[in-house]
């Protein structure tokens, strides 16, 4: 099926996720938080949606963009690094865009970086002219080198990229970095960031016009309700009318205060705060006139 063809009509949405790997468990947990549940096949490669007509296909992460492009799956949870690599490879051979990142999901963060041997003194991209760069992301690297106007040799490897300089097969590397421990163990220093990556929800450029369209819209709304509320807290308290402005100033990073029906002489107020609320901040609010402070975790919401 070409990238411009519409996928065959189906009444069930199909999502591809990693069968195993660092994104597999967080992806399933996220979809479960959206109210999805499944019955697994015996080979554990297909999960039939029970709560909603939304099925899971469990595959290798590098298969996910292609499954979306071919219309086999409607959505996929994959690292932005893999999605961008395959998109860049398609563009470099003249194929149109077939998928796009719809939402960042807030987990699986890493960076695609150039890393050089510790004895190098990094002076900038021009230093790479004629150099051999080992990578598992040749399309992204070639695109970046072209943007910099640098002619370098890209050495494509499928794994163990970090040992290439020690083996003499490359002068430096372009690889994913999380903690940097692997680079340090191989006497490499990260010097330039090509891409900030995280898990994303990817979907076809062309939205289906059958029953899947409403399922897709509903799932996106639920995902927003889960992802956007992660690490946010609902703060509830009472205060007198003359303390509201001062308290609002102390909560400038939060959503506007919402007034609830009055409880006796005090107002009941609530707001959504980003990140954790420390004891020090709660005590500061108390000194400013807040009473009965209560902090609640928010599991999900609908805007």
From Swiss-Prot:
Gene3D superfamilies on file: 3.30.70.120, Periplasmic binding protein-like II
Signal peptide feature range: none
Summary of activators and inhibitors of this protein: Feedback inhibited by histidine.
Cofactor dependence: Mg(2+)
GO terms (BP aspect): L-histidine biosynthetic process
Pfam families: HisG (PF01634), HisG_C (PF08029)
EC class: transferase
InterPro entries assigned to the protein according to its UniProt record, in alphabetical order: ATP-PRT_HisG_long, ATP_PRibTrfase_cat, ATP_PRibTrfase_CS, ATP_PRibTrfase_HisG, HisG_C, N-reg_PII/ATP_PRibTrfase_C
Cellular location(s): Cytoplasm
Domain of life, per lineage: Bacteria
Tagged with keyword Nucleotide-binding: yes
Pathway note: Amino-acid biosynthesis; L-histidine biosynthesis; L-histidine from 5-phospho-alpha-D-ribose 1-diphosphate: step 1/9
Disulphide-bonded residues: none
SUPFAM superfamilies cross-referenced by the UniProt entry: Periplasmic binding protein-like II
HAMAP family: HisG_Long
UniProt function note: Catalyzes the condensation of ATP and 5-phosphoribose 1-diphosphate to form N'-(5'-phosphoribosyl)-ATP (PR-ATP). Has a crucial role in the pathway because the rate of histidine biosynthesis seems to be controlled primarily by regulation of HisG enzymatic activity.
Family assignment from sequence similarity: Belongs to the ATP phosphoribosyltransferase family. Long subfamily.
Protein name (record): ATP phosphoribosyltransferase
Annotated organism of origin: Stenotrophomonas maltophilia (strain K279a)
């Amino acid at each position: 099926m070409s990238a411009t063809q519409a996928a065959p009509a189906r009444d069930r949405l199909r999502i591809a996720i990693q069968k195993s790997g660092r994104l597999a468990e967080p992806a399933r947990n996220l979809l479960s938080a959206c109210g999805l549940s499944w019955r697994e096949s015996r080979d554990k490669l297909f999960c039939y949606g029970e709560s909603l007509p939304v099925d899971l296909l469990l595959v290798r992460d590098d298969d996910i963009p292609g499954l979306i492009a071919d219309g086999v799956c409607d959505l996929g949870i994959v690292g932005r690094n893999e999605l961008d690599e395959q998109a860049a490879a398609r563009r470099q051979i003249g194929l149109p865009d077939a998928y796009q990142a719809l939402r960042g999901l807030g987990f699986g963060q890493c960076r695609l970086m150039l890393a050089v041997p510790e004895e190098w003194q990094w002076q900038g991209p021009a230093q790479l002219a004629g150099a051999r760069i080992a990578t598992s992301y040749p399309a992204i690297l070639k695109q970046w080198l072209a943007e910099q106007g640098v002619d370098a040799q890209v050495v494509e490897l499928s794994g163990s990229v970090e040992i290439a300089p020690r083996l003499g097969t490359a002068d430096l590397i372009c690889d994913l970095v999380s903690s940097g421990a692997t680079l340090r163990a191989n006497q490499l220093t990260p010097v330039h960031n090509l891409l900030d990556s995280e898990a994303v929800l990817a979907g076809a450029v062309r939205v289906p016009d059958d029953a899947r369209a409403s399922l897709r819209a509903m799932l996106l709304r639920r995902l927003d309700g889960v992802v956007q509320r992660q690490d946010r807290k609902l703060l509830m308290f009472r205060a007198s009318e003359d303390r509201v402005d001062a308290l609002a100033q102390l909560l400038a990073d939060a959503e506007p205060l919402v007034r609830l029906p009055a409880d006796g002489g005090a107002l009941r107020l609530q707001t959504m705060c980003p990140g954790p609320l420390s004891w020090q901040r709660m005590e500061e609010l108390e000194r400013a006139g807040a009473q009965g402070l209560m902090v609640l975790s928010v599991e999900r919401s609908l805007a």
